[in-house]
């Protein structure tokens, strides 16, 4: 594939120990040699070496930066192209100067995700692996990064390719049947083979889809909203679960003015914890904005931790709030058990019915273990599956697998009903195409461009 040479800063902007300018393409080494002065020309050094030298402005002869330059030659690189990585000091001005020089002498500024896109276009990775690269970068827990790494290593790709190969074998048998319609024994054997193989493929698709709910939680975190009246201990609960003092804990109602968010691993379950401003009527403009954001967070939650104050009797406000959340997945927490009990637990149970109830003291860190176990049990049936399993965690993949499952069921129904094989062939071909979209072999250029546009610059 004949592509130009691209360049970008591949480290976060800002001050730091190191900043890296990356080039990829057929002229990467040539462009770098125009700027680099060291013991040897970069064109003459072995691949996969790091070389000390300086970046010189060819026009002014000014020494721009002291650098270490990595030389990586095709095809054993991420993009399967020649790659140069110029390791600079991490100052903003200097690294931008080096970037500008690479563009002045022949490179083009890379688009977001273009390095990974080239890895895909050059056959280094498939589309599902490319998507997993971004999942890995964005992962907030160890479990999420492990699931993404498994996909980068090609575990999902291998399963999809295996099913596509099985479909090709069915299609080959169907072709024999179409070519020799006069032989009844061929038709019978084809139908039997088609049904047997199709049901196995459907079973494998179902197995993958069964991991979808957990996979999505692993990837995105279980969106968990802590809600309750002001000053019932919501921020203390957030701090205890994340074991940090991120939220301001005071005795003043309305202290949390915004939605606070934190990722935490709770007994193997990655939570995206959201501490909301207390939902109440208020004239404070800033607090009012926080309340509106709280309502939005509630509407998007997977789990709601509804907090009550042991030191106060239930109020109409508690009833009103619970009415808002009662049809969701809720755990009710009666907090501040270290204080005098003024709440009627039986009244609480009457209000919440069969909803799980936990009693805690965030001040004394009591009841937290029970709460964590309840969260795990509610979503994972008491057991979090092995993170080394192959999970389907991407919404696009889940949608395509559901389409494939329906289409293969259509093919099974058609074959069992005696529909002509050339009609069944249409469904089988469509399944092969749908599964190909997951790994990018049959994906449209528009889809590919859209997916890679979501990447960051330099990746």
Curated annotation (Swiss-Prot):
Q: Name one GO molecular function term.
A: GTP binding
Q: What class of enzyme is it?
A: hydrolase
SUPFAM superfamilies named among the record's database cross-references: P-loop containing nucleoside triphosphate hydrolases, TrmE connector domain
PANTHER family per the record? TRNA MODIFICATION GTPASE GTPBP3, TRNA MODIFICATION GTPASE GTPBP3, MITOCHONDRIAL
Question: Subunit structure, per the record?
Answer: Homodimer. Heterotetramer of two MnmE and two MnmG subunits.
- Please list the residues that bind GTP: 231-236, 250-256, 275-278
Task: Tell me the residue numbers annotated for binding (6S)-5-formyl-5,6,7,8-tetrahydrofolate.
Answer: 22, 85, 124, 459
- Annotated ranges, domain TrmE-type G: 221-380
Q: What is this protein called?
A: tRNA modification GTPase MnmE
InterPro entries noted in UniProt: G_TrmE (IPR031168), GTP-bd (IPR006073), GTP-bd_TrmE_N (IPR018948), GTPase_MnmE (IPR004520), MnmE_dom2 (IPR027368), MnmE_helical (IPR025867), P-loop_NTPase (IPR027417), Small_GTP-bd (IPR005225)
Domain of life assignment = Bacteria
Compartments where found: Cytoplasm
Function, in words: Exhibits a very high intrinsic GTPase hydrolysis rate. Involved in the addition of a carboxymethylaminomethyl (cmnm) group at the wobble position (U34) of certain tRNAs, forming tRNA-cmnm(5)s(2)U34.
GO cellular component labels: cytosol
Residues that, per the record, bind K(+): 231, 250, 252, 255
């Amino acid at each position: 594939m004949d592509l130009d040479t691209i360049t970008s800063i591949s480290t976060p902007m800002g001050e730091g120990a190191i900043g890296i300018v990356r080039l990829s393409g057929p002229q990467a080494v040539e462009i770098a040699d125009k700027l680099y002065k060291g013991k040897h020309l970069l064109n003459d050094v072995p691949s996969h070496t790091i070389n000390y030298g300086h970046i010189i402005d060819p026009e002014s002869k000014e020494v721009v930066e002291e650098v270490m330059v990595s030389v990586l030659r095709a095809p054993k690189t991420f993009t399967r192209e020649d790659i140069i990585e110029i390791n600079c000091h991490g100052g903003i001005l200097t690294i931008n100067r080096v970037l500008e020089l690479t563009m002045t002498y022949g490179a083009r500024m890379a688009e977001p995700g273009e390095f990974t896109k080239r890895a895909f276009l050059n056959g280094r990775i498939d589309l599902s692996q490319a998507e997993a690269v971004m999942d890995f970068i964005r992962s907030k827990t160890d479990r999420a990064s492990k699931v993404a790494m498994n996909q980068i290593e090609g575990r999902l790709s291998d399963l999809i390719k295996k099913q596509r190969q099985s479909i090709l074998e069915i299609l080959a048998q169907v072709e024999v049947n179409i070519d020799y319609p006069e032989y009844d024994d061929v038709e019978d054997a084809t139908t039997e083979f088609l049904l047997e193989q199709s049901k196995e493929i459907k079973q494998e698709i179902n197995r993958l889809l069964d991991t979808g709910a957990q996979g999505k939680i692993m990837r995105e975190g279980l969106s968990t909203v802590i809600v309750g009246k002001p000053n019932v201990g919501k921020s203390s609960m957030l701090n205890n679960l994340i074991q940090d003092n991120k939220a301001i804990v005071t005795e003043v109602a309305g202290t949390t003015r915004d939605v606070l968010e934190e990722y935490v691993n709770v007994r193997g379950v990655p939570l995206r914890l959201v501490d909301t401003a207390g939902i109440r009527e208020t004239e404070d403009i800033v607090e009012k904005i926080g309340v509106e954001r709280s309502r939005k967070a509630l509407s998007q939650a997977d789990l709601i931790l509804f907090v009550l104050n042991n030191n106060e009797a239930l109020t109409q406000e508690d009833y009103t709030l619970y009415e808002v959340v009662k049809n969701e997945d809720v755990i009710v927490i009666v907090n501040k058990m270290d204080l005098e009990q003024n709440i009627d637990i039986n009244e609480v149970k009457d209000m919440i019915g069969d909803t799980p109830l936990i009693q805690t003291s965030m001040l004394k860190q009591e009841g937290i273990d029970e709460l964590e176990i309840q969260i795990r049990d509610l979503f994972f049936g008491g057991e979090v599956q092995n993170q080394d399993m192959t999970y389907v965690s991407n919404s696009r993949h889940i949608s395509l697998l559901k389409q494939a499952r329906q289409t293969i069921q259509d093919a099974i129904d058609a074959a069992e009903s005696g529909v002509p094989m050339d009609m069944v062939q249409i469904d089988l071909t469509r399944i092969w195409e749908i599964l190909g979209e997951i790994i990018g072999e049959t994906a449209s250029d528009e889809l590919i461009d859209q997916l890679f546009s979501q990447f960051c610059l330099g990746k």
